Regions:
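Short clusters of hydrophobic/aromatic residues that line enzyme substrate/ligand-binding pockets
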Residues: 91, 259, 276
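A generic structural signal for short, non-catalytic loop/turn and secondary-structure boundary residues
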Residues: 18-23, 83-84, 104-109, 252, ...
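Residue-level detector of functionally pivotal "anchor" positions at catalytic/ligand-binding pockets or at interdomain
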Residues: 272-286
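Short, charged, low-hydrophobicity "junction" segments
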Residues: 27, 61, 162-166
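Short, surface-exposed beta-strand/loop "edge" segments at domain boundaries and coil↔beta transitions
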Residues: 97-101
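N-terminal module-boundary/linker segments of secreted carbohydrate-active enzymes
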Residues: 30-96, 268-269
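Domain-level detector of nuclease and nuclease-like folds
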Residues: 103-273
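Bacterial Sec-dependent N-terminal signal peptides
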Residues: 1-33, 276
Length: 286
């Protein structure tokens, strides 16, 4: 009985450690079931995207900040440094920081909404605001520099006080270009968000567009830039880091990022870079 009370008052990472220490059980993260994507096989375009939505929606949702398992806890597992697991790897810079330094009055790390939370104005509400598939640890200053910029090629390198980050920004187009090592990661997270949130059950309908809006302050549920993201997806293919991260998130949220498991799904839905101008999701923002 005391075991039950004790476990209920632990967070998930602590529960994993508890079972390992007490019972010698090694908990492995869930792998993709053989039939997970079977309903999407043989489809393309909107039909495939809708089928994938049916597969990955209804996931387990966690709070942004809570005394129970929250986004902070999950990110410490998904993005931990494999050399020093007490640290997390900061997404845009590639630097590491003590995982326990959650924000820490601005001197630690924060949570980056890769699909900017103002693009749809969903904030940190459960669902798009707490979906770990599109959240990454980030240096506080770098997070502020990225702001809610669109994803596109930049011109001016963003130099942090600790040194170069490999990221670029463009003030004229309000765009952000991440370092080469995570360009594909960004693309696949953005594609996940459009696929997961299609406007059902009162949720937002997130859409990736291929034009930079004139109004950078718009809170419409859109993000750019599709043709650039397709290029990044191709040039920076899925690696073992992303695959492992997908597995860890699956063990919590019970859904996966299809574009990590099957990168070919991207072209099946959005086409290639050369065909993107004809894609039906482009919309008139005027």
């Amino acid at each position: 009985m005391c075991y039950i009370w004790f476990i209920k008052n632990l967070k998930l990472p602590q529960i994993h450690l508890f079972f390992f220490l007490i019972f010698g059980i090694s908990i492995t993260y869930g792998q993709i079931p053989t039939s997970y994507y079977s309903s999407a096989e043989g489809l393309s375009g909107t039909d495939m995207k809708d089928a994938l939505n049916d597969i990955i929606d209804g996931h387990v949702k966690f709070s942004y900040t809570s005394s129970n398992t929250d986004v902070w806890d999950i990110l410490k597992e998904t993005d931990k440094d494999t050399i020093d697991p007490s640290k997390v790897i900061l997404f845009y810079s590639g630097w590491t920081v003590d995982g326990a330094q959650e924000y820490n009055s601005g001197s630690g790390w924060t949570r980056e909404h890769v699909w900017a939370k103002s693009r749809g104005d969903f904030g940190t509400t459960q669902g798009p605001g707490t979906d770990v598939h599109a959240l990454r640890p980030c240096d506080v200053s770098v997070n502020s520099a990225r702001n809610n910029r669109w994803f596109d090629f930049g011109e001016d390198e963003y130099i942090h006080s600790d040194g170069p980050t490999g990221c670029y920004k463009n003030s004229n187009t309000w765009s952000w270009e991440p370092r080469d090592e995570v360009k594909g990661d960004v693309a696949r997270m953005i594609f996940y968000m459009e696929t997961r949130y299609e406007g059902e059950n009162g949720e937002l309908d997130l859409v990736v567009i291929d034009s930079i809006p004139n109004d950078n302050n718009t809170n419409e549920p859109i993000h750019a830039k599709l043709s650039v993201l397709l290029q990044w997806h191709t040039n920076d293919p899925v690696d073992d880091w992303e695959r492992n991260r997908n597995d860890v998130i699956y063990s919590y949220q019970e859904n996966r990022n299809p574009f990590i498991d099957h990168p070919e799904f991207v072209n099946e839905i959005w086409g290639s870079v050369s065909s993107v101008e004809n894609h039906s999701i482009n919309k008139n923002l005027e």
